[in-house]
Amino acid sequence: VMNFLLIRMPLGFLRVRPANFVFTGGVKSNIKDPLITDKTEIVPIHTLDYDELLKGRFDSAVKFDYITFVDQDLPQHSDLISSSKPALVSKKKYYKELNEFFNYLECKYKVPVIVALHPRADLIKAKENFLGRSIFSLKTNALIKNTLFTIVHYSNAVNYCVLYKKPFVLITTNEIEAAHDNRTAAIRVLESFFSREVINLSSKEYLTKPLSIDFDTESYSQYMRDYIKNNNDDIEFWDVVAKTIKF
């Protein structure tokens, strides 16, 4: 309720001045906000993800072919602790369905599935949940750069797939679909934008439907323009910020 009221209060009443600058990462960046007025300077910039591409800060986490799963810690996400929301999925069922899918992929492609662990996930519990598979924390960038393809639900890690022109497979489960919330909506958005068919692990659709592990150059380029980089400058993010706001 407080957030609802605060958003609708005039800035002058709250003694808050409009923003001097807003940095936008793509043509679809949302710049509708009470803090943005006709006095605010809109500065095109790329996302911080693109800085990683510029700096070349990529260490090969492993030296052989593999498939990357981007973990989002859905059964025990730390955000649930401070909210009244129930877990999106049940732990036992979720990891059972995931590991069955991973077993299938490892058999089909003859390479291991490794896990890009959610940064706030428990590493010890993850080892158990993923049946001893290789797990890497804070290595999502490097893992996707060198991967055969990536498995995601609705993660921002899709940015890395686009940057490195790597295919990705969208997955869901019956429990995720039953939620009908912003997370399921995010999956649908990615499905529509990239024309990717979402694989439902609960119904084991991967056993009968061929997985698409290629990518559409046009949709990747469009995503880059819309959400990552809207100009031709290759100046690093913080250099642009410093140059813009210097007094």
Question: Whereabouts are the PLM-identified features?
Answer:
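A short helix->loop->beta-strand "cap" motif at the edges of active sites that frequently abuts
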Residues: A19, K39-T40, K110-V111, K165-P167
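Hydrophobic/aromatic beta-strand patches that form the interior of the parallel beta-sheet core
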Residues: F21-F23, V43, T68, I114, ...
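Short, charged/polar "capping" segments at the starts of alpha-helices
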Residues: S29-P34, L53, H77, R120-K127, ...
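Conserved catalytic-core segment of nucleotide-activated headgroup transferases in glycan assembly
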Residues: Y50-I124
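C-terminal alpha-helical cap of glycosyltransferases
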Residues: I228-F247
